[in-house]
Amino acid sequence: MEQSFIMIKPDGVQRGLIGDIISRFEKKGFFLRGMKFMNVERSFAQQHYADLSDKPFFPGLVEYIISGPVVAMVWEGKDVVATGRRIIGATRPWEAAPGTIRADYAVEVGRNVIHGSDSVDNGKKEIALWFPEGLAEWRSNLHPWIYES
């Protein structure tokens, strides 16, 4: 089953949005496989966003991510990466579809509440980076109520 890395950023944590964000993924039928509430070290943030290191906003992004605790999660389910991106909404909140997390809770791109894997391959890399110890092994009893097979 496909997995995606989802991170509630410091602004989402500070604003008390953790429960609502988790609820949106659960209500869709995805399964939480790993979760950490943590402060991110500068070097770790730089590693996570290494693909953006040549962008002018990179230093500010790193400062933002290390400014407070984040909630790092792994969600599992059919097409969880693409569907998760639709639940999250466009990076620029003003372009996000109504009802998405960013449309509902974000105003500026630099405080857009949440990060989600943008591809299955990047999801695998992000999960390996954030959860090197592995994930909980379990299968929800709800699985047959969500998936046909």
Swiss-Prot record:
Active site: H115 (pros-phosphohistidine intermediate)
MF terms in GO: ATP binding; metal ion binding; nucleoside diphosphate kinase activity
Pfam families the record matches: NDK
Keyword Iron carried by entry: no
Induction notes from the record: Up-regulated in the leaf sheaths of rice plants grown from seeds that were inoculated with the nonpathogenic P.fluorescens strain KH-1.
Gene3D superfamilies attached to this UniProt entry: Nucleoside diphosphate kinase-like domain (3.30.70.141)
Keyword match Phosphoprotein: yes
InterPro entries attached to this UniProt entry: NDK-like_dom, NDK-like_dom_sf, Nucleoside_diP_kinase, Nucleoside_diP_kinase_AS
EC number: 2.7.4.6
Reaction(s) catalysed by this chain's protein: a 2'-deoxyribonucleoside 5'-diphosphate + ATP = a 2'-deoxyribonucleoside 5'-triphosphate + ADP; a ribonucleoside 5'-diphosphate + ATP = a ribonucleoside 5'-triphosphate + ADP
Enzyme class: transferase
Necessary cofactors: Mg(2+)
Alphabetized UniProt keyword annotations: ATP-binding, Kinase, Magnesium, Metal-binding, Nucleotide metabolism, Nucleotide-binding, Phosphoprotein, Transferase
Biological role: Major role in the synthesis of nucleoside triphosphates other than ATP. The ATP gamma phosphate is transferred to the NDP beta phosphate via a ping-pong mechanism, using a phosphorylated active-site intermediate. This NDK is microtubule-associated.
HAMAP family associated with the record: NDP_kinase
Summary of subunit composition and partner proteins: Homohexamer.
Family statement: Belongs to the NDK family.
Name of the protein in question: Nucleoside diphosphate kinase 1
